[in-house]
Amino acid sequence: MSFSQLEQNIKKKIAVEENIIRGASALKKKTSNVMVIQKCNTNIREARQNLEYLEDSLKKLRLKTAQQSQGENGSEDNERCNSKEYGFLSTKSPNEHIFSRLDLVKYDCPSLAQRIQYMLQQLEFKLQVEKQYQEANTKLTKLYQIDGDQRSSSAAEGGAMESKYRIQMLNKALKKYQAINVDFDQFKHQPNDIMDNQQPKFRRKQLTGVLTIGITAARDVDHIQSPMFARKPESYVTIKIDDTIKARTKPSRNDRWSEDFQIPVEKGNEIEITVYDKVNDSLIPVAIMWLLLSDIAEEIRKKKAGQTNEQQGWVNASNINGGSSLASEEGSTLTSTYSNSAIQSTSAKNVQGENTSTSQISTNSWFVLEPSGQILLTLGFHKSSQIERKQLMGGLHRHGAIINRKEEIFEQHGHHFVQKSFYNIMCCAYCGDFLRYTGFQCQDCKFLCHKKCYTNVVTKCIAKTSTDTDPDEAKLNHRIPHRFLPTSNRGTKWCCHCGYILPWGRHKVRKCSECGIMCHAQCAHLVPDFCGMSMEMANKILKTIQDTKRNQEKKKRTVPSAQLGSSIGTANGSDLSPSKLAERANAPLPPQPRKHDKTPSPQKVGRDSPTKQHDPIIDKRISLQTHGREKLNKFIDENEAYLNFTEGAQQTAEFSSPEKTLDPTSNRRSLGLTDLSIEHSQTWESKDDLMRDELELWKAQREEMELEIKQDSGEIQEDLEVDHIDLETKQKLDWENKNDFREADLTIDSTHTNPFRDMNSETFQIEQDHASKEVLQETVSLAPTSTHASRTTDQQSPQKSQTSTSAKHKKRAAKRRKVSLDNFVLLKVLGKGNFGKVILSKSKNTDRLCAIKVLKKDNIIQNHDIESARAEKKVFLLATKTKHPFLTNLYCSFQTENRIYFAMEFIGGGDLMWHVQNQRLSVRRAKFYAAEVLLALKYFHDNGVIYRDLKLENILLTPEGHIKIADYGLCKDEMWYGNRTSTFCGTPEFMAPEILKEQEYTKAVDWWAFGVLLYQMLLCQSPFSGDDEDEVFNAILTDEPLYPIDMAGEIVQIFQGLLTKDPEKRLGAGPRDADEVMEEPFFRNINFDDILNLRVKPPYIPEIKSPEDTSYFEQEFTSAPPTLTPLPSVLTTSQQEEFRGFSFMPDDLDL
């Protein structure tokens, strides 16, 4: 639609509204009926509101037309002015001012245009759902009538009748909004689907608590009029939560109720309020509206924050007295100190009042009913999940970091499906039905479907390249691409790929001109080329193809397998199935006797025994292995998929699998029988010869390699003991080595051994040596070290090389001292949290103090934090390499079976959270700490590391008065300028808006956290606070930071720059990174070179009584016993291998 056509359309709608006003005014003059006059007044009021909206839309359209005709110069000037105002007076982008859903359903709605768009989508969806309800109830009525169940039939019929009335209401309301809607998609700045699709998860989260709702009165409702009754009918109001009736008012004929309800809610989402008229014995719905519990909770939060700000007298940046003028350093110090003292007195007075008034805060307003009328409601909601926190100065408290763990992945045709929660209505891209709350979504292409449907998806994920496809996989040769064209969406429809509701308008929607499916513009290239065919039909065809291929392969395999199996079974005098023959062919061979054993002993079957007597434990293990083999044979016989997979192995076994025995004539007998069976199947002769030759060669090589490994292992052990071990130690080691070989021979599958149990002191030292080399040089990777001889051929060569390596490095390894937890005395607990514990420890060798951070391996494995642990170690080494003055350095790291340990330098001055909670920081002191933190962040960013967990608890104070950043658990490397990541992590009050929106983000998130940190140091409270995480997140996304009205302009300026919600416009987000922040007027009297070289005297030096003084740490930590709970070893070899190379022992270690 062109601008001229759109302008004509708006003028027509304006004329309609003017006619409604004239007609209602004329009718009102000619009647004395009170009801008619009231209706006319309502029509006039609504028409004037619509008229104002249409005239405003016409002005916007003409302005846009003028801008296009004059060029873009004027718009660029306006944008430049807006960006200047945006940079200092507001931290929000002009496009971010979107009203909440609760604001849009209020009678005094701030934006009628947004309400029209929101209600059009909601009414379309409700209409579709109600039609489904009506259809289902109609079918149920007929079914119950057939069964003769009159009671259930009447209930279903009543439900169908109510759905009929609801559909009439919704259609009427939908036509009302469609009549005045103006489509501005040609020059729209903001997509319509922001209200739903891009809402963070917590915005529509199910809540638990107590809902307080007061229903006072209603007005302008179109009640049912009957000529038989002079009085208005009785009216009720019902309250539903997630389609369940929770409360109902008393009947009223004058639309006044004045009733209050307190409704306990358990994981509720949507509230429905419906007005019913009672006609005879039936209730007929006449008006309806919907609210979300999360919107009510957000409204209560804003109202509570507003009350607190009014009591404090704080304002946003645009109302600061100083404006943009920059005060002198002395003036800013005095002003801020005065403000801080005022804050202290105010916050101390209001802490108790804030707690007591939380449950009493409510919102009262007139809300719009559909299709006509308004209702006066008083709404309040108290969450039962709110955490009672100890209120300290300004409300600052400790909070652990959060991180989104990796979800379980379900793979299907290259898709990586994970289970996701959705709090708006989604549509399955496979079957087309609605999803309620949860579904399976591909991490790569965002394809969405039910859990029950994901196994039926036949289309490849776009992330799967052609080289990843299986050549034998069944394919559907239906390649008819869609013809997607831009189209205007006029109803509520869902994307056929990602399942989200499609926005209204033309820019973001595509429709296939052939088959009619619709999708987002960004999803069009992901939709498979199945034009004219549904997903379900494609799946049926593909399954038929797969079944046909499977049956054909089964027929080919059955005839020859049966013949050959019967011939072999007859020849051996036993009936052996092909699967058992395959099992025998693949079974490991018995070990060969050693060279010094002249005659084979019966006791040596399956092992090398040091004695000639039977060992009852060994016999028991052998019997258990036999029992396991029988279970495996039974499983193989019953598993068709396994038979398909092992078809080649079966054929090999059928021709060349002799009985395993020590009888040297057995092989000849079995070969003779095999030749006999081959004569009965001439068609397979050439293939069978090839298979038999390969198997015999494989057997010979295997026996030779096993014998060689045993000989080499014995010789190497002897060489290692020469000139270093006395006779007694040598005998002890010989006995241990023999036991090791016995255990190795007994264990048929040695995949669950523990490398940490297998290490002797020498191999442990070798591993430490290799680990330190690998970390410092970052060029050599540590090869696994193991003393066991593996029984699989692919592990034999590495074992030999590892043993040789241990012999070569023995002399050097013997000089390196081993460090373990036994080398330390554990003194006090310094802190604990999600990560584990930090314990003050003293070295037994040097009496040096250190802080040991202890992490449990099983927690790291369960939470998929292996990469985080590696990154933490890497950042520790980065800080230690240059001995950075403001970063915590690492002494060493080591591990046990169940834990890993970082031995760090002990910083005895406590963290800044303790100091801020116990003493207010002056501006000079806060600026000094901020400068040192800034230089630490600069070093991280210059080396491609983002920190992501900057907060007061992670900044420690040294005995000299300087700061050091600690806890590198959330750091990520390889984050240079322009690189992005998307992990949802951080401490709630410090998380940047782009993280909460689950967008990809850059190093700019550290500058947002730096702004929050500086705000807390100067004003002793958070710029964005709430009673729980969801409230904090909402505050970060929607609220402006507030300041004392007399705060200095330079302080406000740096806050506004760092706390800008748009990451591209944020201070420090450019290529110059920290240099932008260092050039701010706030730091103009700071010499950063002197700060870096510790030439500036700290403004505060903590009083530390002794090296072991922990008075600056929380007593709840230091009073806990410094012990580690014993843990059972539950990690497998593969899990332990994840921690290989973690240990770090520098050459100059002095512990």
Swiss-Prot record:
- Any one annotated GO CC term: nucleus
**What biological-process GO terms show up in the record?**
cellular bud neck septin ring organization; cellular response to starvation; fungal-type cell wall biogenesis; intracellular signal transduction; pexophagy; positive regulation of cytoplasmic mRNA processing body assembly; regulation of fungal-type cell wall organization; regulation of nuclear-transcribed mRNA poly(A) tail shortening
Q: Where is the C2 domain?
A: 190-309
Q: Which UniProt keywords apply?
A: ATP-binding, Calcium, Cell cycle, Coiled coil, Kinase, Metal-binding, Nucleotide-binding, Phosphoprotein, Repeat, Serine/threonine-protein kinase, Transferase, Zinc, Zinc-finger
Tell me where in this chain the AGC-kinase C-terminal domain is found: 1084-1151
Resulting phenotype, residue 1023 to S: In cly7; temperature-sensitive mutation that cause cell lysis at high temperature
Q: Is Lipid biosynthesis set as a keyword in this record?
A: no
Q: Where are the zinc fingers (Phorbol-ester/DAG-type)?
A: 414-461, 481-531
Name the residue ranges with Low complexity bias: 792-806
UniProt lists compositionally biased (Polar residues) regions at 560-577
The answer, when asked if tRNA processing is one of the entry's keywords, is no
Write down the top EC class of this protein.
transferase
Q: Which Pfam family, giving just one, matches this sequence? A: C2
Where in this chain does the record put each Protein kinase domain?
Answer: 824-1083
Q: Where is the composition biased (Basic and acidic residues)?
A: 605-620
Give the binding site residues for ATP: 830-838, 853
Q: List the active-site residues.
A: 949 (proton acceptor)
Sample GO molecular function, one term = zinc ion binding
Q: Which residues carry this modification: Phosphoserine?
A: 226, 761
Alphabetized Gene3D superfamilies for the sequence: 3.30.60.20, C2 domain, Phosphorylase Kinase, domain 1, Transferase(Phosphotransferase) domain 1
Q: What does this protein do?
A: Required for cell growth and for the G2->M transition of the cell division cycle. Mediates a protein kinase cascade; it activates BCK1 which itself activates MKK1/MKK2.
The entry assigns this protein to a family as follows: Belongs to the protein kinase superfamily. AGC Ser/Thr protein kinase family. PKC subfamily.
What protein am I looking at? Protein kinase C-like 1
- What is the species listed in this Swiss-Prot or TrEMBL entry? Saccharomyces cerevisiae (strain ATCC 204508 / S288c)
